[in-house]
Amino acid sequence: MADWLIGIIMGAVEGLTEFLPVSSTGHMILTGHLIGFDDDRAKVFEVVIQLGSILAVVVIFWKRLWSLVGIGKVTDGPSLNLLHIIIGMIPAGVLGVLFHSAIKEVLFGPGPVVISLVAGGILMIVAEKFSKPSTARTLDEITYKQAFTIGMFQCLALWPGFSRSGSTISGGLLARVSHTAAAEYTFILAVPMMVAASGLDLIKSWDILSTADIQLFATGFITAFVVAMLAIVSFLKLLSRVKLTPFAYYRFILAAVFYFFIM
């Protein structure tokens, strides 16, 4: 298959699934297997196109991101600030640094991914069932305690297949944060976390990068960026109506497909 076509297919899958609670890792592994793109080059490619998805968040939430560093203000009252982000980053950041190699060795495999797809779906159903009325209906109403709780749930995203947005939005619901506010906080929180993780992976895989792959990487990056932009905007509109439950059932179906096609 031509590199440009691989770039478009994989970039579209990455952009569509990175910020939906369905596990981008599971979809990328399955798609790569189906089109025969699952070698060492594919692993570096996934890191590069993930940066395209991150750029989409930066473009959509640029006013928020500027306000976090003291440039501009989105509201006259109390608002989300940099400390909210730092607090949310600490749990997964510490865990990721301490156990990065162990996580890569133990959890990056077909079996663990299938288990996490199911476990993540169960968590989402439980969160919907037992969540109480929201005390933080908007992003600016999130407390430091709620930010830390969401950060704790983000640790689950270190397990491939669990889904960053699925785990953090579920944590937000259990901490009495509304669906939309939890999702927006999740996306903003993902920027520093994903940049750090992707940067680390790129450094470790630097010797695999080649100028011969520029077309592949560029096509995938641009496709992931465009599709992620559309996916994020659509998901935020959809979330207020359909909640997490349909995504949970989809994860169960994906786990079955993954089991029969990959394992």
Swiss-Prot record:
GO terms for molecular function: undecaprenyl-diphosphatase activity. It comes from Bacillus thuringiensis subsp. konkukian (strain 97-27). Belongs to the UppP family. It is a multi-pass membrane protein. Bacitracin is thought to be involved in the inhibition of peptidoglycan synthesis by sequestering undecaprenyl diphosphate, thereby reducing the pool of lipid carrier available. Catalyzes the dephosphorylation of undecaprenyl diphosphate (UPP). Confers resistance to bacitracin. It catalyses: di-trans,octa-cis-undecaprenyl diphosphate + H2O = di-trans,octa-cis-undecaprenyl phosphate + phosphate + H(+). It is an enzyme of class 3 (hydrolase). InterPro entries: UppP. GO terms for cellular component: plasma membrane. It comes from the Bacteria. GO terms for biological process: cell wall organization; peptidoglycan biosynthetic process; regulation of cell shape; response to antibiotic. It is found in: Cell membrane. This is Undecaprenyl-diphosphatase 3. Keywords: Antibiotic resistance, Cell membrane, Cell shape, Cell wall biogenesis/degradation, Hydrolase, Membrane, Peptidoglycan synthesis, Transmembrane, Transmembrane helix. The chain crosses the membrane at residues 15-37, 42-62, 83-103, 106-126, 142-162, 183-203, 216-236, 242-262. Its EC number is 3.6.1.27.
